[in-house]
Amino acid sequence: DAALLNQQDAPADDKIDIFLVEADNALKYVDTDYTAPVKDLGITDADLSKQYQYTKDIVTDSKGVLKGVSWQGCPGVLFYNREAAKDVLGTDDPDEVQNYVCDWDTFNDTAAKMQAKGYKMISSVNDTYRVYSNNVSSKWVEDGKVQVDDNIMKWVDDSKKLVDAKEAGTFDMWSDDWSKGFYPDGKVF
C-alpha cells in the first residue's frame, strides 16, 4: 500500500507496474486510480474468453471495467464422508447427495439429520465461510463506512444455529482437531 501511495514521487525504476492481490483484497484496489484497465495493456476480451467469469468479476470496477486477470481458478467443492452419507442419507452417490446440500436451507436440514445420527455436518463453521463471502454483492467499505453484506450476516446466523444445535464443530481451521473430521472416527459428514 505504501508503495502505491508513493507512485507519483517514485523514480521511474521504482514505480509499480504489476502487483498481485488476493481476491479478499481485490475490491480495495479495483475502484482506484492505482489500477488501469486491462485493455490498456493490449489484453482483449477474446484473450480472456476462456477464463471463469468469477475470476473476472472480482477485479471488475463499479463502472464495469476489467482491472485485473487471474492466473488460477479455485472451484468450490464439497468433500463428504461416504460412510456418513450412506448411514444418514441412505446413499453415497454424488448426484443423490447433492440433493441434500443443494442450498443453505437444505444443507441445514441435513445437518440436523447428521446430528441425530451422531455426526457433525462440518468440523468448523469456517468451512462454509468462503461460500458465503465469495457471493456477496457489496464492498466491505463504501464511502468510508463499513458495511456488512447480507450474505455475511446469513453465514453468522446459520453458523450460530449449527453450533447451538451441536451440528457443527468449532475447531480452528487447519488444526489437528479440525483435520480429524476427515477420518471415519472424526464423525464429520
Give the location of each predicted region:
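Short catalytic/ligand-binding loop motif for oxyanion handling, primarily in non-cytosolic enzymes
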Residues: 26-30, 76-78, 129-133
